């Protein structure tokens, strides 16, 4: 809601239709102010800079050298020049507002509406416009404004032109970038596309193309005028008359912008909260789960940002280019050997002015290298949910799981963005298993599911780890993954079209270590890259058993112990190494698990 004082129009004896027009015009000014309040706060400084040339000329042409340093003289000159220059910019603000309202209110394009605007124009013009001795610079400004205002008005509109000096008429005929001045201003202020032209851009147009003529004509007008200083002791060049009023206006502008910004932010927050609530209700995500996931996002934000930078660099480097050379081309780099061999023909072609038909040039160009990338990358997270997982271990595992899945999601999005420029497409998916005495899949790959469904599963898999599954039977879940890999290998066309990565997080040694070791070795023979991460304090016997399972032939297991805060970083570092190796894969090469720390 915008309030405009009605007495602004009553004192000018406007009727109802004219008041309505002026209300529309004031709303245009308000829209301009709201669109770029910061520029309006500093517009006075812009006018001061624009008036520098006029102030210099006034000092030189009007006042004696002895009087230039007087405070009264400086105040008068600054105020006078500021007022004159500002009037030019404010005039074309009014011109823009005039057209803005007219183009958006169909009534004012009709003959009746156009006649109303013409009569209102003459009423606002007043006696000042009819004065035959108007200063040259004001004749120029108002005459140009009139031409722009009535650029496309119907011929029936009655409009009177003020008397113009021949010098002014000559300036108005000046071409700007090969176009008549009024047509140029009209095209810049009112483009055919209908786009809104910001105040800053309009001020630049006026400053660059009109201000010079305005100041020159002003100089011709005041060259023979005698100025007298009367009652200007406390006069200021500030259009707000005093600093206090100016600061008050600026504070109001800042308050309006701050309020609008807060309202816009609150509106976005309300929309986001509404969408989040609908999402949670749709997929049965409790407020407790949402709160815990928000905590995980905050605590792992820095790690995720670092991984995004790494993914962008990795994917960018994965696109390889090779130089190709082509000879005997009509253009390019001259091949001296070819030129010597066809030199007799060259002389003949030269006489016929056909020498450019000779193919004696080499051309070098780049083509994208055809490299073989895996069509699918699958990452399985196997997380210990046994009773020995205490609060600290669960929190660390949740953070590691959340940031890893989110980072893989980011990697997949970046890879999809680049897919349009590559001959192959690589998709990446993740799944999550909780294991204890038995195991359960809490997140599937979701290849045929919607993005919302996959996001909901990611949230639940990140926050539902609670340590309620009893023992530590990791062998069973690893056998399940092995069986799935065997089925998958039978369906893929080659070993390099499918890459499988398994990351196991556990807080102790396996309940069935021998079965676990045999399954891990079998997975490695199948080309699966598998790694284990141990968290929590263990006895020497348990440590030896862990090494026997994971590091008997090759070091695939990492003992973190009580350094729980390192788990998210080490998990992400492993993903970095693995996916870096995947993107360096060439045709015919097979992936094998190897030590990454």
From Swiss-Prot:
Protein name as annotated: Uncharacterized protein TP_0246
UniProt domain VWFA: residue ranges: 378-575
Residues annotated as signal peptide: none
SUPFAM superfamilies recorded: vWA-like (SSF53300)
Origin species: Treponema pallidum (strain Nichols)
